[in-house]
Amino acid sequence: KPWETIIISDNLSWNEFSKINYYLYDLPGLKPVITVGRNYPYNESYSHVLGYVAYASKEDLSSNEIINKRHVPGLRVGKNGLEKTFETQLIGTNTIQRFEVNAYGKRINQLEVQNGDQGNSLRISIDTEIQNYTGELLKGEAGSISIMDIYTGEIIAMNSSPSFNPNDFLYGINTKEWKNLNSNPFKPLVNKTISGLYSPGSTIKPIVALSALENNIIS
């Protein structure tokens, strides 16, 4: 039966990683691995548009056949935003190597190699400069700003406030931070542009006015 990989710790500093490698001879069964992962350089600015990735849960595995098929320990998947919407296109496959080992865990023969792939790239229409500017306008406020190119229909900016830092979820957000996000009355996890519920208010007035003009009720 193949041995299962168990992740003891991740997101190690280079100093920690080097120290483990130095004592590796005295740590049988342990294998330090350098991997690639997500990084969100604009922090809160794109959080509601891009969403974030986090460790795949049992629900992710049961609801998505592709995630279940490609699951390996430590797999991170999209939880909301574009990360979740395009998960099946963005997810890659890991390189898998299987070895025959002796009683001491030493490799004696390579049995199988499956080369992985990176998955697809995704290009969006958001203008970073305008996106950051809308974030500055919303700083300290609760609300949202959305800007669309009227000729192409492309979304140039979509910002919701308050926001959150998607990098906090990469290696598991702690209980206190998660509780603070969920208990915040201004709902930083909600994209107010597309998920907020609002009464029509003055937005319906132009529609009523145009209808009245069309029917010669007003001039």
PLM regions and their residue ranges:
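An amphipathic alpha-helix/helix-turn recognition signal
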Residues: E129, M148, T203-I207
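Residue-level preference for non-acidic, small/hydrophobic
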Residues: I20, V49, T134, G153, ...
